[in-house]
Amino acid sequence: MHAENSFVIDDWYPVGALAETVSGRKYHTRILGTEIWYQLADGTVSAGLADNTAELASKSIYGLLWVSLSDNPRDVIAIPEFAEADRRVVSAGSIRVATSGLRVIENFLDMAHFPFVHTDILGAEPLTEVAAYDVEIDEAADEIRAVNCRFPQPKGSAAASEPVEMQYVYRIARPFIAILYKTCVIDANRLDVLGLFVQPVDQESSIAHTIMCYLDDINTDKQLRDFQQRIFGQDIMILINQVPKALPLNPRHETPVRADALSSAYRRWLNDRNVTFGTTRG
């Protein structure tokens, strides 16, 4: 049994996009309610507690700067696609959201809202049904995957020129990290990778760092960024109006609907790992 919140304390958290970080400038932010600083200088990341009583582990990978509060953090998750030379790694920005980071992740996993929130982009009426998909627990990696996900989308990516039934694989790698592998319209034999890396600022606020790892020789970085920011911008009003802001982990709050199978698995997974930060059990 995990000690309360050890599963989140012993992890790494993004604090900024590498492309948007000014070298030599000292930044101040919070992780899990703890005030910290970080800096990029001569290609090296450094970080510490805001009161300068301790240095913190830090690194740069996947287009982000990362910091851990732990003296012995586990490894950063592996995303092999980032090492593929023909992929574009583009930041879609770091957006502050006035809700628990776990809420941000759960919203990312939800396909049911596509036709109603992302109308004529990720979905459209009357095609509103979420087809059955499979949820798998990878015991060795301690991750959740949803496979065989599919949804008809009018414009499933910035590169899409016509409607297509997008194929999705969701990977919940850590409580505050979810990776989406989706149909690549440029290369049918490979998948685009969209990473949502959430920085839990405190119990009820977070910063969503989104990184695209795409096979796209059509769009500029700005066009890729604009497309993804439009999608996230449509989600903001939903996220900030959710009550409570913390993610409910009491089983009575779960809705046993097929479309919510991944969300239910995510909540149980958090509960089983004694994650209480950013949650409520009321």
From Swiss-Prot:
It is an enzyme of class 1 (oxidoreductase). InterPro entries: Cholesterol_7-desaturase, VanA_C_cat. Keywords: Alkaloid metabolism, NAD, Oxidoreductase. Coiled coil: none annotated. The keyword Signal does not apply. GO terms for biological process: alkaloid catabolic process. GO terms for molecular function: oxidoreductase activity. It catalyses: 7-methylxanthine + NADPH + O2 + H(+) = xanthine + formaldehyde + NADP(+) + H2O; 7-methylxanthine + NADH + O2 + H(+) = xanthine + formaldehyde + NAD(+) + H2O. Its EC number is 1.14.13.128. Gene3D superfamilies: Naphthalene 1,2-dioxygenase Alpha Subunit, Chain A, domain 1. PANTHER family: 3-KETOSTEROID-9-ALPHA-MONOOXYGENASE, OXYGENASE COMPONENT, IRON-SULFUR DOMAIN CONTAINING PROTEIN. Involved in the caffeine degradation, which is the essential first step for assimilating the carbon and nitrogen in caffeine. Probably catalyzes the N7-demethylation of 7-methylxanthine to produce xanthine and formaldehyde. This is Probable methylxanthine N7-demethylase NdmC. It comes from Pseudomonas sp. (strain TJI-51).
